[in-house]
């Protein structure tokens, strides 16, 4: 299934005209490189305001999430919640999508608004502490295995607060591909990718800047077929793969 099917779905529902500016993107530039989409698990455009379905959107660390203005918007936890905690205070809005299959293809739009960048946030991840894309004003990088290994990076793809990002991620076995509109395409192969974390929020996840907000839109998640694309065995060899580097966290192990 092509990402353009999202646009076709929105047209058929008559909601294109009321969608936020994050839809001003050519989804045709984001098509699966590795996997073949199968059954749709989640298609969400957040057209109705209100509370979120907790079985689909799992708020983390007491942070607050609701559908507003055509997006899923996340805020930090309340001052009362933070005062009651000794750790995991919820200073940054965090959410996970537990309906994400173990192997998947997922397309989504997101942005981080306000707040402060730190060494940890903001990020998007796939599996809790399994595969994480960290956004920084110095560039963006991909870290895996409990953030111990940096396996991809781009100095040119810098974090811009308030900017909408559009991504397509694919995971099958120990292989992962993620691509961004007007950004990098990364391929990673690591054994940790095939192992779900036994704790925390699994599936697609996001964490915003400290004391800031996260906005999410245009979420489409599919199960995938058992076979990969015919072109994949050759295509995987075309990626420029960096030699993994231990992070500060990895060096302490």
Question: What residues fall within each predicted segment?
Answer:
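Extracellular carbohydrate-recognition regions
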Residues: 25-59, 227-253
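Beta-strand-rich interaction surfaces with strong enrichment in secreted/lumenal proteins
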Residues: 31-32, 92-98, 153-159, 205-206
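Short tryptophan-centered beta-strand motifs in secreted/extracellular beta-sheet-rich domains
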Residues: 46, 106-108, 163-180
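Extracellular beta-strand elements of beta-rich domains used
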Residues: 46, 217-221
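Extracellular glycan-recognition surfaces and repeat-rich motifs
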Residues: 50-80, 249-250
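Secretory/extracellular carbohydrate-interaction modules
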Residues: 76-143
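Short, aromatic/His-centered strand-loop micro-motif at the edge of beta-sheets
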Residues: 145-166
């Amino acid at each position: 299934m092509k990402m353009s099917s999202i646009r076709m779905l929105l047209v058929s529902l008559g909601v294109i005209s009321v969608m936020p500016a994050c839809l001003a993107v050519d989804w045709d530039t984001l098509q699966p490189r590795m996997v073949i989409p199968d059954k749709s698990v989640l298609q969400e455009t957040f057209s109705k305001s209100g509370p979120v379905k907790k079985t689909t959107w799992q708020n983390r660390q007491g942070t607050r999430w609701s559908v507003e203005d055509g997006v899923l918007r996340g805020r930090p936890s309340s001052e009362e919640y933070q005062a009651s905690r000794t750790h995991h205070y919820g200073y940054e809005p965090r959410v996970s999508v537990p309906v994400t299959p173990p192997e998947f293809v997922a397309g989504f739009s997101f942005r981080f608004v306000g707040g402060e960048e730190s060494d940890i946030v903001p990020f998007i991840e796939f599996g809790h502490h399994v595969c994480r894309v960290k956004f920084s004003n110095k560039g963006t990088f991909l870290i895996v295995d409990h953030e111990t290994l940096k396996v991809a990076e781009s100095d040119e793809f810098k974090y811009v607060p308030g900017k909408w990002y559009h991504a397509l991620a694919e995971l099958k076995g120990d292989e992962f591909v993620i691509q961004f509109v007007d950004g990098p395409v990364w391929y990673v192969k690591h054994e940790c990718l095939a192992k779900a974390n036994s704790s925390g929020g699994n599936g697609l996840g996001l964490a915003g800047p400290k004391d800031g907000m996260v906005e999410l839109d245009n979420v489409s998640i599919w199960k995938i077929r058992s076979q990969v694309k015919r072109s994949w065995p050759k295509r995987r060899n075309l990626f420029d793969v960096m030699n993994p580097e231990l992070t500060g966290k990895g060096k302490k192990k």
